[in-house]
Every structure is written in structure tokens, then in C-alpha cells.
């Protein structure tokens, strides 16, 4: 039986950790001039994927 393909977009966006999957915070790529320094600072740290979405990410990354 052939191997299951990994979704390459998901592989670039998520990283497996011991407690789940790590992801980058959204809304921090461009159009940052109208956002305050406080808002940009709050968007800086990585976050965990929500428990409702973990099954979807696991399906996209079967070998993670």
C-alpha cells in the first residue's frame, strides 16, 4: 500500500511539539502601520493549535 501524502502547506505552517502543534499568529504579515505596538507585540509569540482543530492537522500531517 502506498504512503499517505503530507499536505505541504500544513507542513510549512505547523510544527509538532510534545503538547500538540505549534502555529504562527495570524494578522502579522503586512498592513502593520495602522496597528499599535501593543497589538503587534501580542501577535509575536507562537500559539498552540486549538483542540478542535488538532484532528484536522493530524490528518494533513500523518507522519508528524
Swiss-Prot record:
This is Large ribosomal subunit protein bL35. Pfam families: Ribosomal_L35p. GO terms for cellular component: cytosolic large ribosomal subunit. GO terms for biological process: translation. Belongs to the bacterial ribosomal protein bL35 family. InterPro entries: Ribosomal_bL35, Ribosomal_bL35-like, Ribosomal_bL35_CS, Ribosomal_bL35_sf. GO terms for molecular function: structural constituent of ribosome. Keywords: Ribonucleoprotein, Ribosomal protein.
Amino acid at each position: 500500500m502506498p504512503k499517505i501524502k503530507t499536505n505541504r502547506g500544513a507542513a510549512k505552517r505547523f510544527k509538532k511539539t510534545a503538547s500538540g502543534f505549534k502555529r504562527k499568529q495570524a494578522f502579522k504579515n503586512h498592513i502593520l502601520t495602522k496597528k499599535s505596538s501593543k497589538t503587534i507585540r501580542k501577535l509575536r509569540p507562537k500559539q498552540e493549535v486549538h483542540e478542535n482543530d488538532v484532528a484536522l492537522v493530524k490528518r494533513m500531517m500523518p507522519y508528524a
